[in-house]
């Protein structure tokens, strides 16, 4: 007699080497396409390796393609805010090497995992985190991390010790070190790093310096692993 049902497990795809090493993702959300390549250059100068272009950015597909053509293997390019299979396919066709979502679509995660594509789905509760991991996630994005805080991540890490968590949404210079100390696998960095004002005012030296600070903080997660 079967007492408990079970979902067939999907093997988790390892994070790309660049992300495993750097433990940080720079998120370009609604960045001016005309300034995209300069923004990427500044992030690379600051030591960032993984850069995510969100799919709700104007001209996201064209931006992915332009960055891929301009930088090639110099950047680990990903697509974020991917909501369905069509968007994931378009992203992969235009240079993305990993997929990030604000939610967990188990079918999409499993489909990408079976193809060997790294996927970082979003989750908040313990139930969602476990579902994302069992679907085949490479890393689980804890979102929105800033709203629940460092203590929440630490509490999740208690029962879910072996699931890598990437706090995203509200990660800043004020709390980044605390997230790492609480057991975060790495950091998802939005406007606290890719500040729209720095980009629009072409203050790329400041952007590079800010990136270097976050890179040093995130590196502590790799050393602690």
Q: Residue spans of the language-model regions?
A:
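Conserved N-terminal beta1-alpha1 strand-loop-helix module at the mouth
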Residues: 2-97, 104, 114, 162, ...
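Hydrophobic, well-structured mid-protein blocks that either form specific transmembrane helices
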Residues: 89-132
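Conserved beta-strand positions in the central sheet of alpha/beta enzyme cores
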Residues: 52, 100, 120, 139-141, ...
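Anionic-ligand binding region
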Residues: 125-138, 150-152, 156
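Glycine-rich phosphate-binding active-site loops on the catalytic face of alpha/beta enzymes
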Residues: 102-108, 142-149, 184-203
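Short secondary-structure boundary segments
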Residues: 55, 81, 102-104, 123-124, ...
């Amino acid at each position: 007699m079967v007492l408990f049902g079970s979902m067939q497990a999907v093997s988790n795809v390892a994070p790309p080497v660049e992300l495993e090493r750097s433990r940080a993702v720079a998120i370009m959300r609604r960045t001016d396409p005309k300034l995209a390549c300069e923004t990427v250059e500044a992030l690379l100068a600051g030591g960032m390796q993984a850069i995510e272009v969100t799919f709700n950015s104007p001209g996201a597909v064209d931006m992915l393609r332009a960055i891929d053509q301009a930088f090639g293997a110099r950047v680990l390019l990903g697509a974020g805010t991917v909501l369905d299979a069509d968007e994931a396919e378009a992203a992969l066709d235009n240079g993305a090497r990993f997929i990030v979502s604000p939610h967990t679509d188990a079918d999409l995660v499993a489909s990408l995992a079976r193809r060997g594509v790294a996927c970082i789905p979003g989750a908040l509760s313990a139930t969602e985190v476990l579902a994302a991991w069992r679907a085949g996630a490479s890393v689980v994005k804890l979102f929105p991390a800033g709203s629940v805080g460092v203590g929440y991540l630490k509490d999740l890490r208690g029962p879910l010790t072996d699931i890598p968590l990437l706090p995203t949404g509200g990660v800043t210079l004020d709390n980044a070190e605390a997230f790492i100390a609480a057991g975060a696998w790495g950091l998802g960095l939005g406007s606290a790093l890719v500040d729209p004002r720095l980009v629009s005012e072409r203050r790329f030296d400041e952007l590079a310096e800010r990136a270097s600070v976050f890179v040093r903080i995130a590196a502590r997660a790799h050393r602690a692993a």
